[in-house]
Curated annotation (Swiss-Prot):
Protein name per UniProt: Uncharacterized protein pXO2-13/BXB0012/GBAA_pXO2_0012
Compartments reported by the entry: Membrane
Keyword flag Transmembrane helix: yes
Keywords assigned by UniProt, alphabetized: Membrane, Plasmid, Transmembrane, Transmembrane helix
Amino acid sequence: MKVIDIANRRRIYFEMKQQELRASILMTVAGFIIAFAILVFQISFELGHLYHYIVTFAFLTYLSLHLYSNNKLARKIEKKQQGY
């Protein structure tokens, strides 16, 4: 007879998902830092084309926030953890 520890599996699953959520937040922050560093570096060399970099940075910022706000998995995990 095989005994399956469902509670332990769920706990491990939710811990993995929490780590994935933290990693996605860290990746988003790292993306912002890299984008900002590239922007500063480019502005220092090409002040005449400043609007290209401002538009690009704004687009990347919007895209990052849009992807993060639509992360339904993160919302489900937060709801389930609040229920425990």
